[in-house]
From Swiss-Prot:
Functional note: Probable circularly permuted 1,3-beta-glucanase involved in cell wall modification through beta-1,3-glucan network alterations such as increased branching or remodeling. Plays a role in engulfment by host macrophages.
Listed GO biological process terms: cell wall organization
Compartments in which it is found: Secreted
Organism of origin: Candida albicans (strain SC5314 / ATCC MYA-2876) (Yeast)
Family according to the record: Belongs to the PGA52 family.
Catalytic reaction equation(s): Hydrolysis of (1->3)-beta-D-glucosidic linkages in (1->3)-beta-D-glucans
Protein name per its UniProtKB record: Probable circularly permuted 1,3-beta-glucanase TOS1
């Protein structure tokens, strides 16, 4: 890469602004001010990424083709999966759509979608794979492992509503067979989600870091009408959503020597796989452990989800340019270990095509590297830190087929090491609002227009995009 004197001066200017703004440098990242809200404005662009069209289980090679997108929030208007990394306890999760929206992924006739009650760096798509565990699948199908930016604080103003845009589903077909030895064991990659949460060369430590108070340069989105809850979880109960993890070959999903474990149904405490969908009990997952929430709607045989790995557990994500995610969680400290991602919890969104192919592993086996979309909502970047940041990884502001664009804020949310954190993420128009709400906030069966617009109008830290 070439560096000009202009680039050097810009970097020095940014560093000077950071210091003068009173930002701190901790664990390789800059942090500025605590915030209750981060706002992304002007999100969505016309571009392309490389979509997976086939995965060869025998060679470990994948093929791709260019996929075009455009519109508000694109590519994040496509189906998204919701990811969690420990140490974390999830107490509530929900997804809302405008009451007049057709984006619901509820299948009334599918038994997997019924309400179920039982007793009670970034993380994801790294390019380099490290073998971290050896996995044995016993005769009962159980998995046994051996461990071998510039930000500004603004006051939002009301504005006219923006129309929602539907995403165009990409379709594909593929072949491949599940490979494996008769004894069903082998070394696999990152079964428990080990790997940096995000690529270091596009982390927030390289973003502009000054913080200044100035009025908003554009109006803020508003909504018309109520929002209806489409998916919901509390411990031991799921409504139109499903918990998955990476224990493929243990009750559900598949395993192969080249691609390792596919997605599987998670068991009740996320310690392994399951043969059927099971609601997660109230459980605290340990550092490095992960699970994923998808909608309760299975992908069909007609490739309505686009291409996905043969034999994997495949469900639709949460689509649309107008949607709201709600969360309640704890992120307790976990000092009992020294592994990668130790005591670095996170909550983030991925283009749902990524986990349905290969979240961790060969870069050409998912669309992540080429910019199909990741949004970090609440992420701890260094071990033991009490600061959670948000960051967007896609190609906006960068070249085609790249995730070197995006951006974020270096203002941070306080990590809930004791007590719970209630968070709301609103996708509307060309904006994304991520905010902490009061502990008394209830996530009922619907959200009224007044409540959502009040959240949108709250002041917050505005993220810089395309630096």
């Amino acid at each position: 890469m070439k560096f000009s004197s202009t680039t050097l001066l810009a970097g020095l200017s940014s560093l000077t602004a950071t210091v003068s703004a009173g930002c701190s440098f901790e664990g390789g990242n800059y942090y500025c001010s605590e915030t209750k809200k981060v706002i992304y404005k002007g999100i969505g662009f016309s571009g392309t990424y490389m979509d997976v069209t086939n995965m060869d289980e025998s060679t470990g090679k994948c093929t791709q083709q260019s996929y075009s997108f455009s519109g508000n929030l694109s590519p994040l208007d496509e189906e998204l999966s919701v990811h969690f990394r420990g140490p974390l306890t999830l107490l509530q999760f929900g997804v809302y759509y405008p009451s007049s929206s057709g984006n619901s992924k509820r299948q009334i006739d599918d038994q997997d979608c019924n309400v179920k009650h039982v007793h009670h760096k970034h993380k994801r798509a790294t390019e380099v794979v490290q073998v971290t565990q050896t996995v044995f699948v016993d005769g009962n199908g159980n998995t046994v492992t051996s461990q071998a930016l510039q930000t500004s604080t603004v006051e939002s103003s009301p504005a006219v509503s923006s129309a929602a845009a539907d995403d165009n589903a990409n379709s594909g077909s593929g072949s491949g067979s599940s490979a494996g030895s008769g004894s069903g064991y082998g070394s696999v990659s990152a079964l428990d989600g080990e790997g940096k949460a995000y690529r270091s060369d596009i982390s927030t430590k390289s973003a502009p870091t000054s913080t200044s108070a100035q009025p908003s340069s554009s109006e803020t989105a508003s909504v018309d009408g109520a929002w209806t809850r489409d998916s919901y979880y509390t411990p031991g109960s799921t409504d139109n959503c499903v918990f998955l993890n990476y224990h493929g070959g243990s009750g559900s999903g598949v395993w192969s020597a080249k691609f390792g474990n596919s997605l599987s149904y998670a068991n009740a405490d996320n310690s392994g796989g399951s043969s059927t969908p099971v609601p997660l009990e109230e459980t605290t997952i340990k550092s490095g452990e992960e699970y994923i929430i998808f909608s309760g709607s299975k992908c069909g045989s007609s490739s309505d989800c686009g291409y996905y790995r043969k034999g994997t557990v495949a469900y639709h994500g949460f689509k649309g340019a107008s949607k709201i995610f709600v969360f309640e969680f704890e992120m307790p400290s976990d000092t009992n270990g020294n592994g990668y991602n130790q005591d670095m919890p996170a909550v983030w969104l991925l283009n749902a095509k990524i986990p349905r192919t290969l979240q961790y592993g060969e870069a050409t086996c998912s669309c992540w590297k080429t910019g199909c979309g990741e949004l970090d909502l609440f992420e701890v970047l260094s071990s033991g830190s009490n600061k959670m940041i948000s960051h967007l990884h896609d190609g906006q502001g960068s070249s085609q087929n790249s995730n070197n664009g995006g951006g974020g804020s270096q203002d941070y949310f306080e990590r809930p090491t004791s007590g719970t954190f209630k968070g709301v993420v609103i996708f509307e128009g060309d904006e994304i609002h991520i905010l902490q709400v009061d502990d008394e906030t209830e996530f009922g069966s619907s959200l009224d227009e007044e409540t959502v617009n009040a959240w949108l109008k709250e002041a917050g830290s505005v993220a810089t995009i395309g630096y």
